[in-house]
């Protein structure tokens, strides 16, 4: 067994075989990728066990980096999508999200692709928001118009700091 590649990929999101990934692990709902970053990973969803993939790899084995996963409050049938991933010191998972605090980087890397069995959904990054776990950001974003993809990772020196990359469906 090899874990889905943590390396950047040049292939477009349409080349990921989502049904084959789901056949290996039924918790997989799609593939997230951002060109020009190392972010290219399967995305998991386990509403009854929200943090299952926090420290577990695609194959269910222990992994410090886990696998990006969809918030248990989210549904693929509509509404906002919130995906969590670790900010790993080795440059994997969502570590590249911290580069979005630089406005030039944000402007040059605005397109986020999320491929599911329904096809490729494209989102355009609109904001990088520094916040914390106690902030009411979820309610604010949930109230905004249009469907959004929010990528969330740890940020800063405290354990409660978060960086949110907010992208609007295009």
Regions found by a protein language model. Give the residues of each.
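Solvent-exposed, non-transmembrane regions of membrane-associated and secreted proteins
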Residues: 1-170
